[in-house]
Amino acid sequence: MAKKIIGYIKLQVPAGKANPSPPIGPALGQRGLNIMEFCKAFNAQTQGVEPGLPIPVVITAFADKSFTFVMKTPPATILIKKAAGIKSGSAKPHTDKVGKITRAQCEEIAKTKSPDLTAADMEAAIRTIAGSARSMGITVEGL
C-alpha cells in the first residue's frame, strides 16, 4: 500500500544554501521531518546550479515522517532580471522601461523554463517569457 501523504510544503530555497534556519526549519519541523536530511539532499542536487539562485521546491511529507521533494526551474522573473542585468523591474512597467533583452535571451530562458511551462511549443514559450519581461518594464528586441 502507498504511504499516506500528510501534506505538501512549497518553498523557494537558494541553490546550494539550504540550512535549518527559517523558512526551511519551521516548515519541515511542523511536520516532524528531518530538516538536516532535506538540507543535505537539496544541496547535493543543486551542486551544478549557480549558487544562490532561488529554486522552487515542493516537498511531499508522509505520515511515517519520510519525505520526497521535486525541484522546479528558477522563476522566470529572476532569469529575466539576470539577462537584462537589473536588480528589479519597473514600478511603472508600461511607461518606464528599465532594460532590454533580445529574442535570443528570451529563447534561452524559455529553454531553461520549458519543463515547467504549459506552452504548446517553443514559440509559445518564448512569447510567454517576452510577456513576463514586458510586464516588468523590460523591452524585448526582435519580437
Curated annotation (Swiss-Prot):
Keyword Glycoprotein: no
The keyword 4Fe-4S is annotated on this UniProt entry: no
InterPro entries found in the cross-reference section: Ribosomal_uL11 (IPR000911), Ribosomal_uL11_bac-typ (IPR006519), Ribosomal_uL11_C (IPR020783), Ribosomal_uL11_C_sf (IPR036769), Ribosomal_uL11_CS (IPR020785), Ribosomal_uL11_N (IPR020784), Ribosomal_uL11_N_sf (IPR036796)
Top-level taxon in the UniProt lineage: Bacteria
GO molecular function, one term: large ribosomal subunit rRNA binding
GO cellular component, as recorded: cytosolic large ribosomal subunit
Biological process, per Gene Ontology: translation
Post-translational modification: One or more lysine residues are methylated.
Key words of the record: Methylation, Ribonucleoprotein, Ribosomal protein, RNA-binding, rRNA-binding
One Pfam family from the record: Ribosomal_L11
CDD domains: Ribosomal_L11
Family: Belongs to the universal ribosomal protein uL11 family.
Function: Forms part of the ribosomal stalk which helps the ribosome interact with GTP-bound translation factors.
Subunit relationships: Part of the ribosomal stalk of the 50S ribosomal subunit. Interacts with L10 and the large rRNA to form the base of the stalk. L10 forms an elongated spine to which L12 dimers bind in a sequential fashion forming a multimeric L10(L12)X complex.
Stated name of the protein: Large ribosomal subunit protein uL11
Native source organism of the sequence: Dechloromonas aromatica (strain RCB)
Record gene name: rplK
